[in-house]
Amino acid sequence: RSVSRGLGDVYKRQLSEVATLAVVTNGFQKVQIRRLAESGVLNFMEDVFVSEKMDSEKPNRRIFDAALRALGVENREHVLVVGDGLSSDIQGGVNAGLDTCWYNPSHAENPGKVVPTYEIADLKELYPLVMEQEELANVGLKNRRHQC
């Protein structure tokens, strides 16, 4: 998806050093893993949760709940769902009671049915969303307080 293509390897690596990154996606396991590998994003992910194996799909909250359990997430306030699909990614995050960030590089108009917590046009804008102000000066250090 465009989310994985929107960020260079250096930024993916830096982001993975300050946040636990995981993918929640709909589709078939083999196809999605191949796509993630081809995009270069797979190397930076803690885990990948594909609807075929999860017995649920976005926007159902169950797939997000299962992913958070598998990742050992205890505090949902430190979770940010980032996605480019309002009806699946963002609605799924909303359904799961999570903060959401709509990746909207084309500045498309939001029809307003699904309201994300944040909206960004460049994935570099994620840094201030997942890091405390004092952490921004230390990009590159292992600090996994936040999870995307």
Model-derived features: where do they sit?
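Asp-based, Mg2+/Mn2+-dependent phosphohydrolase catalytic module
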Residues: 20-148
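Short amphipathic alpha-helical segments and helix-helix/interface helices
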Residues: 12-13, 90
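A short, Lys/Arg-enriched amphipathic alpha-helix followed by its capping loop at the start of a domain
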Residues: 14-18
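Single conserved hydrophobic/aromatic residue that forms the stacking wall/gate
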Residues: 1-11
